[in-house]
Amino acid sequence: MIDTVVARRYANAIFALGKKDGDDALSSRGECLAALGEALAAAPGLDMTLKSPVIGVEEKKAVLDKLLGKLKADQTMRSFCFLLADKERLAFLREISAWYGKLLDEAKGIVRGELVTAVKLSADKKAKLKESLEKKTGTALELTFAVDKDILGGMVLKMGDRVLDASLRAQLGILRETFKRGE
């Protein structure tokens, strides 16, 4: 719980700075934070180094400086990451990245979701389905596609805290309940 509060607070702070600097800064900082999060996920040793209380702040800053140099981070991002090091908050970097991504999506009007189907869809069908869903919802969608043979047919769309279940499994479940009640 406290992890979430800390991560959200720092994500809000760097996002507010990005808003002042313009849309390009918002996007580039989002990309930088996402790349940092991916680097930490891909290299557990790096993640452990930045989280370790045994390693000094200056050593952590040196590692961050090299990493941020490779990512071509602007001075504000560098200062932000160094502040996290000074405040012993580098352990929250991945969570900060995730929260920043949510804030950025919200600012751009993008809704992320998952579309589950019973069979694998072609790229053309995915594009048409995405376009149709965007028209119906009135928002820009970023969808990930998954296959679950257990739904038998149809689809299940998960967007945020909403679930639209248009699967054959759900329809059969409704039919079963109707028969049980004797309607």
Curated annotation (Swiss-Prot):
Gene3D superfamilies for the chain: N-terminal domain of the delta subunit of the F1F0-ATP synthase
According to its UniProt record, what is one Pfam family this protein matches? OSCP
* Membrane topology classification: Peripheral membrane protein
Q: Which residues form a coiled coil?
A: none
GO cellular component terms given for this protein: plasma membrane; proton-transporting ATP synthase complex
Q: Where in the cell is it found?
A: Cell inner membrane
Cysteines engaged in disulfide bonds, as pairs: none
GO terms for MF:
proton-transporting ATP synthase activity, rotational mechanism
Q: Does the keyword Transport apply?
A: yes
Sorted alphabetically, the keyword list is: ATP synthesis, Cell inner membrane, Cell membrane, CF(1), Hydrogen ion transport, Ion transport, Membrane, Transport
Instruction: Tell me yes or no: is Ion transport among this UniProt entry's keywords.
Output: yes
Its job: F(1)F(0) ATP synthase produces ATP from ADP in the presence of a proton or sodium gradient. F-type ATPases consist of two structural domains, F(1) containing the extramembraneous catalytic core and F(0) containing the membrane proton channel, linked together by a central stalk and a peripheral stalk. During catalysis, ATP synthesis in the catalytic domain of F(1) is coupled via a rotary mechanism of the central stalk subunits to proton translocation.
Q: How is the quaternary structure described?
A: F-type ATPases have 2 components, F(1) - the catalytic core - and F(0) - the membrane proton channel. F(1) has five subunits: alpha(3), beta(3), gamma(1), delta(1), epsilon(1). F(0) has three main subunits: a(1), b(2) and c(10-14). The alpha and beta chains form an alternating ring which encloses part of the gamma chain. F(1) is attached to F(0) by a central stalk formed by the gamma and epsilon chains, while a peripheral stalk is formed by the delta and b chains.
- UniProt cross-references to HAMAP family, sorted A to Z: ATP_synth_delta_bact
Family to which the UniProt record says this protein belongs = Belongs to the ATPase delta chain family.
Stated name of the protein: ATP synthase subunit delta
Task: Give the species.
Answer: Desulfovibrio desulfuricans (strain ATCC 27774 / DSM 6949 / MB)
